[in-house]
């Protein structure tokens, strides 16, 4: 079934070294791959992402709906709507995630 951002993201946002996450779909409608984009908290080095990703997978495995999220990508800083700084630019993030996956990131 479908995954909803408001059900998925809070599960991962509790991680102390994560600033925020954004669930995006990559691929053709109906056959989309769930990708969780992860923005690390201030001061957290990108080199720590492999460990953080493992911990996020463990968090996700505790819930049936988040266990299905298999792809995690570190993003340096989410694009946001200029008018509403907190509103994440999900379309841009989805395009970025698709490009990362094409490059075999």
Where in this protein do the model-derived segments appear?
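AMP-binding/adenylate-forming catalytic core of the ANL superfamily
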Residues: 1-65
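Conserved C-terminal "lid"/linker of ANL adenylate-forming enzymes
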Residues: 20-26, 36, 57-105
């Amino acid at each position: 079934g479908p995954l909803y951002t408001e059900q998925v993201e809070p599960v991962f946002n509790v991680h102390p070294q994560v600033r925020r996450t954004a669930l995006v779909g990559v691929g053709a409608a109906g056959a989309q791959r769930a990708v969780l984009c992860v923005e690390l908290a201030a001061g957290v080095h990108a080199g720590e992402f492999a460990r953080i990703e493992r911990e996020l997978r463990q968090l996700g495995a505790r819930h049936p709906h988040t266990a299905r999220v298999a792809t995690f990508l570190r993003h340096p800083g989410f694009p946001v709507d200029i008018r509403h700084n907190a509103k994440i630019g999900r379309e841009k993030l989805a395009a970025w995630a698709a490009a990362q996956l094409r490059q075999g990131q």
